Regions:
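Alpha-helical scaffold domains
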Residues: 1-112
Length: 112
């Protein structure tokens, strides 16, 4: 939680620390403690590491289920790297927490 109160830098943190921080945001800050700035924090993370990118996609897929309106703009505005964008859509479509109508919309947002 202290990372949210201080100038935590994802850039200087190790892979495990980054993944752990994203998971904490996903678990504790997508419902009653939600703030759209957390979406922006995660979207700014740039990495070539598979597990970091998978964690980012998992975070955004979960965010779609819990904060649809705030999260959808990251896909419609193409604010995520291509791989993360498409993996987010894949994971969200696999979720039981997303409606069929939402899944159809997400399918149309896939990028090539």
């Amino acid at each position: 939680i202290s990372m949210l109160q201080h100038d935590f830098s994802f850039d200087s943190a190790g892979s495990y620390t980054v993944r752990f921080a994203i998971e904490m945001l996903m678990v504790y800050f997508l419902e009653e403690n939600f703030d759209p700035k957390y979406l922006a924090m995660v979207a700014k993370i740039q990495s070539d590491e598979y597990y970091i990118n998978m964690m980012i996609a998992w975070y955004f897929a979960t965010a779609l289920a819990k904060q649809w309106d705030s999260t959808l703009q990251y896909l419609t505005e193409e604010r995520l790297p291509l791989w993360v964008h498409n993996k987010t859509i894949q994971k969200a479509i696999e979720s039981y927490r997303i409606t069929q109508e939402q899944k159809e919309m997400l399918r149309r947002l896939r990028r090539k």
